[in-house]
Amino acid sequence: MNNQQKIKCPICGKQNTWSPDNQFRPFCSERCKLIDLGEWASESRKIPGSSIDPESIVTSNNKQDNEDEQ
């Protein structure tokens, strides 16, 4: 019995099989995989959320370092 799930490529919508044989899953091809990577790299795709002030990260890390030293 073949229980391989059919999925749509998130880039082009082409039907493909979710299986270990598909090295590009969930994409249908290397081309679609690279298009997706390019969209993330150019920030046209991003995870929604609020921006983080880089200065607050430095301050937070410095506080943690000081606490670790004590």
Curated annotation (Swiss-Prot):
GO biological process, one term: regulation of DNA-templated transcription
Region annotated Disordered, chain positions: 43-70
Cofactor note: Binds 1 zinc ion.
Keyword set, alphabetical order: Metal-binding, Zinc
Residues binding Zn(2+), per UniProt: C9, C12, C28, C32
InterPro entries: DNA_gyrase_inhibitor_YacG, Znf_NHR/GATA
Cofactor(s) needed for function: Zn(2+)
Superkingdom to which the source organism belongs: Bacteria
GO molecular function: DNA topoisomerase type II (double strand cut, ATP-hydrolyzing) inhibitor activity; zinc ion binding
Family: Belongs to the DNA gyrase inhibitor YacG family.
Function: Inhibits all the catalytic activities of DNA gyrase by preventing its interaction with DNA. Acts by binding directly to the C-terminal domain of GyrB, which probably disrupts DNA binding by the gyrase.
Assembly notes: Interacts with GyrB.
PANTHER family: DNA GYRASE INHIBITOR YACG (PTHR36150:SF1)
Protein name (Swiss-Prot/TrEMBL): DNA gyrase inhibitor YacG
High-level lineage: Bacteria, Pseudomonadati, Pseudomonadota, Gammaproteobacteria, Legionellales
Designated gene of the protein: yacG
